[in-house]
């Protein structure tokens, strides 16, 4: 039964969700997201879409855990072993868990780099992104004055997605992504 349970968890069939009512758990080191594609991609917009998905997942988890971050890092892995993975780091002006702020800061740092890799036909095969510091307070933010409004909007989106399934409400930028059998279930049900 353990194998079936593990398969259902990996493939998302268990419909596991992070519940905001559970205040007992808080990650010690932050939250992260990683994705390896079945094939490398030189489509910069698809790579940016994959980053958007990762940032949406990280921000969703931060909101659920009641944490914020101002520093993020990760790496970009390539299809060929000729190119080593590239580490990156970006910061937001203040602690936040608002997807828009994190994505905008990420693109300021990585958009040209991704475009450059793709123009040089350096196929990107994997992405990883994580928080590097955390704030567990709910202190008002002086840099993002509209954070309360955004927080309410994202909490409503989170509730809809928790109720009706992940991806029921999503951003347009996360719809354009790397094509192929990138999900465990897709690779193993052929």
Question: Which residues fall in each region the model found?
Answer:
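DNA-contacting surface of Y-family translesion DNA polymerases
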Residues: 1-121
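Acidic, metal-coordinating catalytic segment for phosphate/diphosphate chemistry
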Residues: 86-190
């Amino acid at each position: 039964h353990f194998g079936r349970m593990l398969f259902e968890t990996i493939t998302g069939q268990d419909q596991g969700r992070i519940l905001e009512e559970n205040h007992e758990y808080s990650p010690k080191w932050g939250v992260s997201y990683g994705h390896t594609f079945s094939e490398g991609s030189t489509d910069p917009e698809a790579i940016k879409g994959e980053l958007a998905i990762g940032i949406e997942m990280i921000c969703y988890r931060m909101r659920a855990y009641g944490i914020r971050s101002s520093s993020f890092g990760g790496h970009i892995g390539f299809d060929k072993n000729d190119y080593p993975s590239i580490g990156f780091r970006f910061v937001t002006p203040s602690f936040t868990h608002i997807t828009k702020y994190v994505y905008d800061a990420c693109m300021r740092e990585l958009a040209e780099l991704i475009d450059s890799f793709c123009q040089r036909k350096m196929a990107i095969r994997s992405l990883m992104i994580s928080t590097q510091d955390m704030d567990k307070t709910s202190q008002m933010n002086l840099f993002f004055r509209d954070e309360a409004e955004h927080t309410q909007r994202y909490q409503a989106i989170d509730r809809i997605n928790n109720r009706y399934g992940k991806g029921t409400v999503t951003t347009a930028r996360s719809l354009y992504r790397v094509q192929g059998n990138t999900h465990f279930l897709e690779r193993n049900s052929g």
